[in-house]
Amino acid sequence: MKICLFFNTPSIYREAIYKMIDKEYDCDWFFGELSDDVKCLDIKCLKHSTILGIGNKGRRVYWTKGLISLLFKKKYKTYFMYGPTWDLSFWPFLIIKALFFRKKKLNIWVHGWYGKETWLEGILKKFMFHVVDGIFCYGDYAKKMLLEMGYSKDKVFAIHNSLNYDEQLTLRKKQHDTEVYKSHFHNENPTIIFLGRLTSIKRLDMILDAVSILKQNGQLFNIVYVGNGPMRDMLEHKAKVLCLSDQVWFYGACYDEEKNAELVYNADLCVAPGNVGLTAVHTMMFGCPVVTHDNFAYQMPEFEAVKPSKTGLFFDFGNVESLANQIANWFSQDNYKREAIRENCYMEVDTNWNPYYQIDIVKHNLKIAD
């Protein structure tokens, strides 16, 4: 029996799990028009795939052309799709399914519940969760909140997230200590890394402020920003104002994963003052722990990879003094051992944040029509 899958964008970071699903089931894939902002996979890597047009593309509220018609195709009795709150085609799809196609099974892959929803968002999400047969959340935090709201544990599952795990695992096995930072900074101070786009929502200026505070207290750290973005000029200026220029390396965007692996492996700590997202999975894959904020309603699901004192720490949301303290606390832990921390990070990703974990969740929990 065929399964109909629909996702808004064929994001390349999901290539591994999509291929596993494609191999496990007889799938027809549908995606929204390719996005200019997201790196997309070649959908030809999937057996049967189609791009659907988007109306009002690029706006918050839009619609997907042809989505509703998929519900009327007799060959589809099981659906697996994302749950787009602002896709105007999705809500008629849900209503028609609830009224006329109750025997068909609808599974959604969504963030779930944040805890910061507006009244309208809350109403829409609750209706969606009521109608669907299976809810695959990105993380256990959202799953826990939905269970507390009364949804059945037989309906809600944590599918987590992943990157190109197999390729990164091959690179991880090749890593060793190098002098990539010693040769650049000409010191042996601990190095803080951030890997990703330099955007305002990530509050990357807080790293500079925290390191400046620590410097005043006699604690010296290097910073490397691996990535480009609209905040780069501001960050470079701020580094000069704080007299940190010799401690900060603006490496720029790097699309060479082998080089990224070396930079992350040899760094001592990743600091993500804003939403951490897949940066946590990326850096832990190569053994680097993470410090990020503790306001989970405003986090991305991957914050769950941070296990205090094992794979990282949390600081008080928006509080630069707390961030500085947690950076210092990380390196002053009793029995601090860099290699043991690497192993903790490896175990977290190898256990919870990879496509093998994800396909296992799908195989055991996907609601399939008779």
Task: Map each language-model feature to its residues.
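A charged, aromatic-enriched C-terminal amphipathic alpha-helix characteristic of glycosyltransferases
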Residues: 332-366
